[in-house]
């Protein structure tokens, strides 16, 4: 079965950056004028600057980057433990991965780059933040009237027919509180069974009302992805390519693979108004069972810079500022929403990275792969194949410590 692909994008491993603090100012500039104050890298190139050119200490950044070389993940480079960790694979995996790598952006410029940042590797659940962006585009286009609408009002493929599933809203999916019940591509939403789920298998429990319990669950995210496909009626990698990745100058090296058994029939109207069932592949929200988004660190950095700039790229608003704000904020209006989780973005609201501002946030994937964004200091850090946890907190601490006091 052929794999669904979009263009491939260069990858620039983990980006660790520190930027000098800037006092907020009130601006009356027009959007075009405001955008002219920011640097946006043209396709195929990216300007480098010394940290000291942007208010940071050169030696401190160099030391932080040197420290990262001691923090590579112990995951085998050949993905040989994939089944043990996650269970039976459904899609492809590369033969090997790159070593630890990353890039640090300050004010949009590269101030540090290490390892092979063009290697195209699986990024695991960082892909969820890309799905979040497609979700935002869907709302921006009016394809969904309200994020609190039940998904079943829009999607009629049987996935939301049962009374319990009929209560699930788009917001529930985006906050991982949906409690959707069913099976996707041979994987049950219960996560029961060692063979199917490896070390990630769960214990039996009672199902809760949608919106009342957070559970990190890739089966439900894959259901969410299929629902978005049902609205767009074209492969989501194509949506991502034309609406986001091409406009930000991403490379042609990134790939979004589907599972081998993830071909579905989508009802697509033709020019005369008649409907035709068109086979399409539905993408996953990660690489837990193979497939998923394979991308370079440098392309991740472009995506991170777009989010840092609140959805604007070089004078063009690709996705609304309102969506970026909602996606990177907690949602206490839902009883089960996690206080440090937005719409498929991890937040620092609970001080997971103690030295970093509470306003910073990250796309996170196993491996560990991460795109950390710090709007307060105008930083983006992409870091690939690191130990995660305390290592992340320490790296951000070292980057932030490199910010020189304002004169």
For the regions a language model picked out, list residue spans one by one.
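N-terminal leader/targeting segments and the immediately adjacent pre-domain N-terminus
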Residues: 2-6, 14-16, 20-116, 141-144, ...
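Active-site-proximal loop and beta-strand segments within enzyme catalytic domains
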Residues: 47-49, 69, 73-94, 123, ...
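Active-site SXXK
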Residues: 57, 108, 122-147, 173, ...
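Catalytic-site signature segments of enzymes, centered on catalytic residues
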Residues: 110-118, 180-261, 286, 291
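Active-site-proximal alpha-helical segments within enzyme catalytic domains
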Residues: 129, 220-227, 291-313, 369-385
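Active-site helix/loop module of the DD-peptidase/beta-lactamase fold
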Residues: 141-180, 232-290, 322
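Active-site Gly/Thr loop motif
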Residues: 265-287, 329-380
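Structured C-terminal helix/loop/strand segments within mature extracytoplasmic catalytic/sensor domains
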Residues: 362-407
């Amino acid at each position: 079965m052929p794999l669904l692909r979009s263009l491939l994008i260069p990858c620039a491993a983990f980006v660790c950056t520190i930027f000098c603090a800037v006092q907020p100012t009130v601006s009356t500039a027009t959007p075009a004028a405001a955008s002219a104050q920011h640097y946006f890298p043209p396709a195929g190139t990216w300007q480098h600057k010394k940290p000291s050119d942007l208010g940071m200490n050169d030696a401190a950044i160099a030391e932080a980057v040197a420290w990262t070389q001691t923090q590579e993940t112990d995951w085998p480079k050949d993905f040989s433990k994939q089944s043990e960790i996650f269970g039976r694979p459904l899609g492809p995996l590369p033969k090997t991965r790159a070593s630890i790598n990353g890039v640090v952006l300050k004010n949009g410029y590269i101030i540090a780059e290490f390892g092979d940042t063009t290697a195209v590797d699986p990024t695991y659940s960082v892909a969820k933040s890309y799905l979040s962006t497609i979700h935002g585009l869907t709302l921006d286009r009016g394809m969904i009237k309200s994020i609190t609408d039940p998904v079943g009002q829009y999607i009629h493929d049987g996935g939301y027919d049962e009374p319990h599933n009929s209560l699930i809203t788009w917001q529930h999916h985006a906050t991982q509180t949906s409690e959707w019940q069913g099976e996707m591509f041979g994987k049950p939403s219960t996560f029961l069974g060692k063979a199917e789920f490896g070390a990630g298998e769960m214990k039996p429990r009672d199902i809760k009302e949608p919106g009342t319990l957070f559970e990190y669950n890739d089966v439900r995210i894959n259901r969410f992805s299929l629902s978005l496909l049902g609205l767009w009626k074209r492969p989501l990698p194509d949506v991502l390519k034309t609406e986001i990745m091409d406009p930000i100058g991403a490379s042609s090296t990134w790939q979004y693979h589907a599972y081998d058994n993830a071909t579905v029939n989508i009802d697509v109207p033709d020019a005369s108004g008649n409907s035709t069932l068109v086979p399409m592949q539905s993408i996953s929200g990660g690489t837990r069972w193979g497939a998923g988004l394979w991308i370079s660190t440098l392309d991740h950095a472009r995506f991170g810079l777009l989010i840092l700039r609140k959805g604007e790229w070089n004078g063009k608003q690709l996705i609304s500022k309102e969506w970026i704000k909602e996606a990177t904020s907690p949602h206490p209006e839902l009883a089960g929403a996690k206080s440090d989780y937005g719409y498929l973005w991890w937040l620092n609201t609970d001080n997971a990275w103690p030295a970093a501002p509470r306003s910073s946030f990250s796309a996170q994937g196993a491996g560990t792969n991460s795109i950390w964004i710090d709007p307060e200091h105008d930083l983006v850090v992409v870091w690939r194949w690191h130990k995660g946890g305390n290592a992340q907190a320490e790296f951000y601490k070292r980057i932030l410590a490199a910010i020189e006091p304002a004169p």
